Amino acid sequence: MKSLFIGYFDGLHQGHLFLKQNSKFEPMVLLIDNPPLKQTNWLYDLQQRVAQIKTYLKATVEVFDVAKHNMNALSFFEQQIKRLNCDEIIVGTDWHFGNDHKDGIWLKKLFKNTVIVNKTNLSSSVIRNYLTNNELEKANQLLVEPYYRVGTVVHGLKKARLLGFPTANIVMDNHLLTLNKGSYIVRVLLNNQTFYGIGFISQKDQDLVCETHIFNFNNEIYGSLVKFTLLKFIRTISKFSSQAALQKAIQSDANFALKWLENQNLDKI
């Protein structure tokens, strides 16, 4: 027997896990992508959303591309939902589907075993607000794993290297949520190895870039795919009167990060 979850699943959170754990059926997810109102503040891209669902919900995933299949709610039900042969459907109170924007109450008339979940403080919009307001640790408590980005290391101007802090530079995806500029404590996953460091997010021409200084690491990793997880916000972006002042600020960030990491159970963050 199967339970079908329908939604964007942008940032898998503890609420999703609770629903899965309290369902009697095998989970399936109908993941909605490319909604008609183009969204530019996604927490994660499609690839990461699918990966999180498979990892944490242990669910099979069907992706429905709205842009490629523009249809009304009845057609969506007949062509997409019915073919999945589910025994239960789970949607949120704020969920609307089809180009005629029908809701869960309408769906329940067609499919009796539809569960409509009330919107709570466990939602992607709440998590976005926490990230926007520099309340990173609150966001991370709601997510199934602390907020992260994935990117390829590119060449930079290497100015930080001259100050004694070589960095791995990753260009941020401009379709995702614009993160606040400033310094962060980060965890870096590179070639299945875990490192820690400080990440500095700043604007470089048209791109938002994260320059990450990895502690006790000085290898050349250009072109490598890395996953960097934001653990704690340190400070907002500042202008410095001299290179010496900038170097002092970076060293202060590093010292703060090292002390903070010493006091954490790293297996639980």
From Swiss-Prot:
It comes from Mycoplasma genitalium (strain ATCC 33530 / DSM 19775 / NCTC 10195 / G37). Catalyzes the phosphorylation of riboflavin to FMN followed by the adenylation of FMN to FAD. GO terms for molecular function: ATP binding; FMN adenylyltransferase activity; riboflavin kinase activity. Keywords: ATP-binding, FAD, Flavoprotein, FMN, Kinase, Multifunctional enzyme, Nucleotide-binding, Nucleotidyltransferase, Transferase. Signal peptide: none annotated. Its EC number is 2.7.1.26, 2.7.7.2. Pathway: Cofactor biosynthesis; FAD biosynthesis; FAD from FMN: step 1/1; Cofactor biosynthesis; FMN biosynthesis; FMN from riboflavin (ATP route): step 1/1. Belongs to the RibF family. The gene is ribF. This is Bifunctional riboflavin kinase/FMN adenylyltransferase. Transmembrane segments: none annotated. It catalyses: riboflavin + ATP = FMN + ADP + H(+); FMN + ATP + H(+) = FAD + diphosphate. InterPro entries: Cyt_trans-like (IPR004821), FAD_synthase (IPR015864), Riboflavin_kinase (IPR023468), Riboflavin_kinase_bac (IPR002606), Riboflavin_kinase_bac/euk (IPR015865), Riboflavin_kinase_dom_sf (IPR023465), Rossmann-like_a/b/a_fold (IPR014729).
